[in-house]
Amino acid sequence: MKTLLLTLVMVTIMCLDLGYTLTCYKGYHDTVVCKPHETICYEYFIPATHGNAILARGCGTSCPGGIRPVCCRTDLCNK
């Protein structure tokens, strides 16, 4: 009986952990819930004309290039 109870507890913990999804900033103030396979929040600048740069934020599977890339793996860490 104890073995069955322990097995049920372990299965429950595993199922809860597998259901976790990351939340990242997208743009300046908006947030987005990442897809299950996207495990990284990123932030970087895209060069634009006249010396300006555009901020890019979101979810990804790997750290992208760009100017001053920042990548992290916790909720809302890309601000």
From Swiss-Prot:
Subcellular location: Secreted
Extent of the signal sequence: 1-21
Pfam families: Toxin_cobra-type
Tissues with expression: Expressed by the venom gland.
Record flagged with keyword Secreted: yes
UniProt keyword terms in alphabetical order: Acetylcholine receptor inhibiting toxin, Disulfide bond, Ion channel impairing toxin, Neurotoxin, Postsynaptic neurotoxin, Secreted, Signal, Toxin
GO cellular component: extracellular region
Disulfide bonds: 24-41, 34-59, 63-71, 72-77
Any one Gene Ontology molecular-function term assigned to this protein's record: acetylcholine receptor inhibitor activity
InterPro entries the UniProt entry points to: Snake_3FTx, Snake_toxin-like_sf, Toxin_cobra-type
Function comment: Binds with high affinity to muscle nicotinic acetylcholine receptor (nAChR) and inhibit acetylcholine from binding to the receptor, thereby impairing neuromuscular transmission. Compete with the binding of alpha-bungarotoxin on muscle AChR (from Torpedo) with an IC(50) of 0.31 uM (SNTX1) and 3.1 uM (SNTX5). Is able of exerting muscle paralysis, spasms and increased respiration.
Family per similarity comment: Belongs to the three-finger toxin family. Short-chain subfamily. Type III alpha-neurotoxin sub-subfamily.
Protein name: Short neurotoxin 1/5
